[in-house]
Amino acid sequence: MENEIIKERFLGTIFGQAVGDALGLSTEFMSKQEVGRFYPNGIEDYSQIVQDDHRRRWQRGDWTDDTDMMLCILDSFVACQKVDFLDIARRFKEWMMNGGMGIGRHTYNVMALGDYTSNPQKAAEIIWKMGKKKAAANGAVMRTSVVGLLKENVTSNAENICKLTHFDPRCVGSCVVVSSIIHALVFEDRILDYENVIGIAKQYDERILSFVDLAYYESLDSLCLDDEKSMGYTLRTLGAALWAYWHATSYKEGILKIVLSGGDADTNAAVAGAILGAKFGINQIPEEWKSGLLYASMLHDKVQEFYAMYR
């Protein structure tokens, strides 16, 4: 593949996530009905984001914890020039201690354990077992896009970085699927088909399979993204991202459909956005969405620095 195409998709992955996250905040935690009420004509721009008690905590055009935590991983890759799990965990904890706005309850509980930074995976396992192994939130899949941009060992790195906070095999499988999809798009110009994704999912947890089926064979509505009791489930987010990957004809179309579905929309759109950015490249992300990001120039500098590691 030409280097220019790789670079476009590489940058598209990171910007695709940040844009999806920032736009998805507009409908986060809303039911689809509420989305219709607040945005009767849809949403096209950050300036339209309603300023209720939840959303006014962020300035329009800012991303949330999804991209913050992804950038903790990216910063670690660049600073260490390698994958260092303890360094990533330290950066997560530092981010949490310095505000950590939007942090999920599960992620907070894991990182609040006293010895988190010395043995993060053990902390994640303890909290998972304390919850009777039921918790499978989307707080790891939301940040895994950047792992797909590593040149090698994507599977093991996605597994281990996931387990810094999320130990459940559904979370681990979600992360490996997303990172593998991005890696294949960026570096191999290859689409993972249904059989490929099922093959990966089976290695982790059979419960992933039904969501792969919904994403491949059914409409986006079949995923019930705004389900009040389980909107933060890792498999709903994975399903939304896979639906966009296989069915969206453009970055914009895929993101808007997911955003207008409500639920945990910033996370769903962040993960789908990373995949669509990897598929279509940074130039296919609407210019006003990229330039409208509050920290667009900082993000651009970070991605360029990460990309330069491969030169």
Regions found by a protein language model. Name each.
Residues M1-R311:
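Structured, active/binding-site neighborhoods that engage oxygen-rich ligands
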